Structure formats: C-alpha cells, structure tokens
From Swiss-Prot:
Subunit structure of this chain's protein: Monomer.
Pfam families according to UniProt: Globin
Transmembrane parts of this sequence: none
Keyword Nuclease: no
Keywords: Acetylation, Heme, Iron, Metal-binding, Muscle protein, Oxygen transport, Transport
Protein name: Globin
A molecular-function term among this protein's GO annotations: oxygen carrier activity
Family: Belongs to the globin family.
C-alpha cells in the first residue's frame, strides 16, 4: 500500500526532498502565502473551502494577515511530515490526523492533490530548491502516497 511507498523512499530520495524543502522552509510563511494565492488562482473552486477567504480575489489576499497565519499552519504541518520521513509510522499518524481534521470542511483527496500540484509548480521555480529530475520524481512519489493515505483515512472514518 501507500505506507509501503513511503517506507520505500530511498535515503537519497528523502535527502533530495528535505534539501529542496529547506529552500521553501527558509521563509515558510512567505512562500506558503505565495502558494496559497497561486492555489486559489489555479483552482478557484477550492478557495470556497476557506471561509475566511471565500469571495475575495486571490491578489487581494497578498499580505493578508489571516492568509499568512493559515499558510504558516498548512505548510508548518507539511514541514512536520517532511521532518518525520525517517519515521513513516509517525508521518502516517500526522497524515491521518490532518485527514480527519479536514473532513468537516469537505476537503478531500482531490483538494490535497491540487494543492500539491501548485506547490510543486512553485517549488520548481523557487531559487535553491532544485526541484527537477530525480528530486521531482521523489516529491511526486511521496506526495502521491501522502494523498492516497489521506484518502484511505477519510474513507475509513
């Protein structure tokens, strides 16, 4: 299953993910805010899941304190998952908690996959992240497994 996919990430793949993530995490709130604004542009329907931001134009949210707070929470959570890659059981626990927390908001696997897609596009253009080739493949493998674990947990609940 997808837990096995996470466990099958090689040391090199995990190192590549962590190294590229470090460029993002250096300004997690700024980069995270940029990703959320772009996410709302890429997937306008998904903005309605965020009641605080529903009905606002994405560009109006640049510099918004609530957006910055939410970005630090969303990407802080992802940061914790990446930090726990060497402990797949802990990572799965974090994913399952995140999956459960998002059920009442109607957020499902599709929205996670869409956010991950925007994140990867952003990281590919982020200086120092070097998300290409084997690093991009490692990210794709990890994020796909994460989205599937979230989906399985939401269906189980």
């Amino acid at each position: 299953g997808d837990v096995d996919v996470l466990k099958s990430l090689s040391a090199d793949q995990k190192a590549a993910i962590k190294s590229s993530w470090a460029a993002f995490a250096a300004d997690i709130t700024g980069n995270g805010s940029n990703v959320l604004v772009q996410f709302f542009k890429d997937y306008p329907g998904d903005q309605s899941y965020f009641k605080k931001f529903d009905g606002k134009k994405p560009d109006e949210l640049k510099g918004d304190a609530q957006l910055a707070t939410h970005a630090s929470q969303v990407f802080g959570s992802l940061n914790n998952m990446i930090d726990s890659m060497d402990d797949p059981d802990k990572m799965v626990g974090l994913l399952c908690k995140n999956a459960s927390d998002h059920i009442p908001r109607g957020v499902r696997q599709q929205q996670y996959k869409e956010l991950f897609s925007t994140l990867m596009n952003y990281m590919q253009s982020l200086p120092g992240a070097n998300v290409a080739g084997d690093t991009k493949a490692a990210w794709d493998k990890a994020l796909n497994a994460m989205a599937n674990i979230i989906d399985a947990e939401q269906k189980r609940l």
